[in-house]
Amino acid sequence: MQATIYDLDGNTDGEVDLPDVFETPVRSDLIGKAVRAAQANRKQDYGSDEYAGLRTPAESFGSGRGQAHVPKQDGRARRVPQAVKGRSAHPPKTEKDRSLDLNDKERQLAVRSALAATADADLVADRGHEFDRDEVPVVVSDDFEDLVKTQEVVSLLEALDVHADIDRADETKIKAGQGSARGRKYRRPASILFVTSDEPSTAARNLAGADVATASEVNTEDLAPGGAPGRLTVFTESALAEVAER
C-alpha cells in the first residue's frame, strides 16, 4: 500500500510505501480497552470525608420510650444512613483501586491497530471526520516540521482538502449537567492529529480540536480518542518511517 507525499503547497512530491504496521487488523476491542485503561490510570483518587454526617451530638434515647432507637437532635433523626443529614451508607473511598491493568503486548497491539485504522478511509469517515479526498493518512514532507505559523498550516490543510474537519471541530457545544460548572463547560470534537518526528508541531497545536505528537510517543488515545478508531491523521515522511518500529 502506497501513499502520496505532499509538499507545503499541497503539490505531489513523490510516493512512499506505507509500513507493514498499517496492515495490522483493526481490533476495536483492544483499542477501547487501552483507552479505558489510560483514562482510569490517570484519575485522581476520591472519597467522602471520614466524619461526614457524624459531626452531631445526637444520641439514641434507648428502650422504654415507645420510639425507634434512632439518634436524634432537636427532635430530628441524625447520623444514621436513612436519615436526612445522616452519613452515607457506603460512600466512595480513596483507598479503592480504580486502576485498570493492560498487558504490554495488548498495549503494543492496540497502538499498531489504531495506526492501521488511520489508513482506512471508511473508518475515518464513519468516525465523523470531514474531508474531500480518497487517500488517508495524509503524508507531507519533512519541511512541515519547520513551520512556525498556524496560518501556514491552515493554507496547507486547505490545499489538501482536509481543513473542513478543523471547521467542524470549531463548533463547540455547551455540555448539559453539572460538569459545565466544573471546568468542563464545552464539548469539542477531536479533529486532525499531527504526527512529527523530532518535536510536536507548535504551528498546528492551536487548531480547533487538533492534537500533536511525535512518532515515538503517539499512543492509542491520540490515535483513537474515546476508543473510536480511525482518526484523520497527518504524518511527516520521517514520522511515517518511525512508526514502523512501534
UniProtKB/Swiss-Prot annotation:
Signal peptide positions on this chain: none
Region (Disordered) location: 37-103
Keywords, comma-separated and alphabetical: Ribonucleoprotein, Ribosomal protein, RNA-binding, rRNA-binding
Skewed-composition ranges (Basic and acidic residues): 92-103
Entry-linked InterPro entries: Ribosomal_uL4 (IPR002136), Ribosomal_uL4_dom_sf (IPR023574), Ribosomal_uL4_euk/arc_CS (IPR013000), Ribosomal_uL4_euk/arch (IPR045240), Ribosomall_uL4-arc (IPR019970)
GO cellular component: ribonucleoprotein complex; ribosome
Molecular-function annotations in GO: rRNA binding; structural constituent of ribosome
Source species, domain of life: Archaea
One Pfam family, short name: Ribosomal_L4
A Gene Ontology biological process term: translation
Record keyword Ribosomal protein present: yes
Oligomer and partners: Part of the 50S ribosomal subunit. Interacts weakly with proteins L18e, L24 and L37e. Has been cross-linked to L18e.
Function: One of the primary rRNA binding proteins, this protein initially binds near the 5'-end of the 23S rRNA. It is important during the early stages of 50S assembly.
NCBIfam families in the cross-refs: rpl4p_arch (TIGR03672)
Family label: Belongs to the universal ribosomal protein uL4 family.
Entry protein name: Large ribosomal subunit protein uL4
Organism: Haloarcula marismortui (strain ATCC 43049 / DSM 3752 / JCM 8966 / VKM B-1809) (Halobacterium marismortui)
Lineage of origin: Archaea, Methanobacteriati, Methanobacteriota, Stenosarchaea group, Halobacteria
